[in-house]
A protein has these predicted regions:
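N-terminal Sec-pathway targeting helices
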Residues: 1-14
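Sequence signature of WD/YWTD-type beta-propeller architectures
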Residues: 11-335
Length: 335
């Protein structure tokens, strides 16, 4: 009897060892493939006091500072040669970009110039209250200009262009409730905006030069999504570059939803135990999906301990990368 128990234990140890070796080799192989992708970029303030914007190397799980400025809710340009973000520091307030080749910081427009444009549209002025917060949200490159959300509720989306050294700003969209994220697509010679709210993803056609105030009658429901008890301020919805697919989470699964076929594809299970998913990002070639899982903060404050994950969208293999420290605070991530 004793001999059988020993044999059983040894067998279990052998099986677990083989499984561990297999998982390690699989993870290493996947990391080798993913390391050829463009770097993940994020802005953060770390527990040790270091802060700014950083490039994250997937293979080594190390990061390199590329700017002392925090780029809030940053996003890559279409060619990934630069990033754009909101900056709120004593040295500069407004929208700026960072060249990813030589790390050159370039102001795009100051907060004072933005406020001058906003005043012409009858929008409330944004006041600088010091480093660490901003009311200019989700800035993105778009066509020959830039888009962004104005003020806390993010329900006013603006389009900014410059002609003959003069800035021009128009309101593309207003929404009655709170808005979390948005994407704009050119569809059949028209512009369509996709909006993530607390429980739905909508789309609507945009009419250049037309501000329909708070008229939501022409919003078209794309997808019902689970109501989040806790949601990242810039949302978690992600869309492919051609805006034909979107990624969303419905516990315990991450899905890719095809807007043309209206079919969903299961990506992977991610069970959450006192946790929330805060970011979903395609890789540049859309072969992989990066996402973050945050431990529920103590007393529901704004401090969230993040875990980084990457999924191979073909094999559906998943690897966990860095588990960050409790007081490492992230302000924007893109891939």
């Amino acid at each position: 009897m004793k001999k059988k128990v020993i044999i059983t234990i040894l067998f279990c140890i052998a099986v677990l060892s083989i499984f561990y070796v297999y998982k390690s080799q699989t993870s290493r192989h996947m990391i080798d493939k993913v390391s050829k992708e463009l770097p993940i970029v994020f802005s953060a303030e770390f527990e040790n006091g270091d802060k700014g914007t950083f490039k994250y190397d997937i293979s080594s799980e190390k990061y390199e500072k590329i700017s002392d400025f925090i780029f809030y809710e940053l996003s890559y340009s279409e060619d990934h040669n630069s990033i754009i973000g909101s900056v709120s520091e004593d040295e500069f307030q407004g929208i700026a970009e960072l060249n990813m080749k030589d790390n050159t910081f370039t102001p795009i427009i100051s907060l004072s110039d933005l406020n001058a444009c906003a005043k012409e549209l009858g929008l409330d002025e944004i006041k600088y209250s010091g480093p660490g917060s901003t009311s200019i949200h989700m800035p993105k490159y778009y066509k020959d200009g830039y888009t962004f959300s104005w003020e806390l509720w993010r329900n006013i989306i603006c389009y900014l262009t410059k002609e003959n050294d003069t800035w021009h700003m128009e309101v593309l969209h207003r929404y009655n409730g709170r808005n979390y994220s948005y994407f704009i697509k050119e569809e059949n010679s028209e512009e369509v905006i996709f909006l993530e709210t607390s429980e739905e993803i909508f789309k609507r056609k945009l009419e250049k030069g037309v501000d329909r105030a708070l008229d939501d009658s022409d919003l078209e429901l794309v997808l019902k999504i689970p109501k989040m008890e806790f949601i990242d301020l810039d949302g978690i919805m992600e869309m492919s570059d051609d805006k034909s697919k979107l990624v969303y989470y419905k516990e315990p699964e991450i899905y890719i939803y095809d807007l043309e076929s209206k079919k969903k594809e299961h990506v992977i299970n991610q069970f959450l135990f006192f946790q929330h998913i805060l970011d979903l990002k395609f890789s540049y070639d859309e072969k992989y999906l990066f996402y973050t899982v945050a431990d529920v903060p103590y007393m529901w404050d704004d401090i969230k301990q993040l875990h980084f994950f990457i999924v191979d969208l073909e094999s559906k293999e998943k690897i966990e990368l860095t588990k960050w420290k409790r007081w490492d605070i992230f302000y924007g991530i893109d891939w």
